[in-house]
Amino acid sequence: CKQGGILKMAEQEFFSINPSTHIRTTSENRRFYDLLVDEKNIFSTKYQLYTFAIMVALRAGAAPDSATKNLDICLVGNVDKDNFAVAKGLVAHLCPEINNGSDLLKRMNEYADSGIAILRTDYENSDEDFDPSAYLE
């Protein structure tokens, strides 16, 4: 099973990421996290939106956003273990040049920011009809 292989690959010690490491984003994206989670309650947690945004970016074929990320979203340990493992595995598979957990998390954050940009554009263009479940189809 290809999916099982990706999960196994993501769990290798080589891709170990300390659970107390901070997941970061840009100030503009942090405001959008706050909007969707704290104000609109579209997502229950920022870490749920984080992994969702990674998947949105990967599915859209978006390039990683390398802007400086200086605001915390959450700790790695807060993120659902299975969702995080899938995101790690997919990003590691797409970026074979990455060979350590620190660089992998940096790239995951870059993909999350790309996904947030896609979601923000959709949100701004859809007024009150924003439905992130459309990305699951």
Where are the regions that the model predicts?
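Charged, low-complexity intrinsically disordered terminal regions and linker tails
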Residues: C1-L35, T51, A63-E137
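Short amphipathic alpha-helical segments enriched in leucine
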Residues: V37, I54-L58
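Solenoid-like repeat scaffolds
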Residues: E39-N41
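Short, solvent-exposed secondary-structure capping/transition elements
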Residues: F43-T45, L58-A67
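Short amphipathic alpha-helical segments
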Residues: S44-I54
